[in-house]
Amino acid sequence: LCLMAARQKSKGSNLLRRLEEIYEEFGYTESITTAIVYKKEKDRERMSAIMTSLFEGQLRKAPEWKPLIKKEFCFRQQNMYMADLQGGNRLIIRPSGTELKLKIYIFAGGSTRDEAIDTASELCGLARRTLEEKNE
């Protein structure tokens, strides 16, 4: 960190300005982690059924997700579903290893921080609604 600061100072800049330049060039990224929590041990089967439906491509068939998903990755051995979404965004769903919950990870980008946050929030809400519907 000290070397980076010294280098930027020698160029008449500083770390904050350099970080702003990087954001201008590459955009902002926001990540959100959330989970659907289950209460009973028997819900483990429900979680398993949801993961199986993801592995079988059911999310891609849902009208609200169809235009968003570019490519799906199913890591059955790790029990993890991942989808690359339009705009360079990403969705990951996997069960917790220690608790009765499905974890949802969203990674979203934007040309501004607010845009990245808004996109991540929208995708997170959509993922939660979709999984909660499958939960009923």
Where do the PLM segments sit?
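Phosphate-binding and adjacent anionic-ligand microenvironments
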Residues: C2-G97, K101-Y105, T112-A120, C124-E136
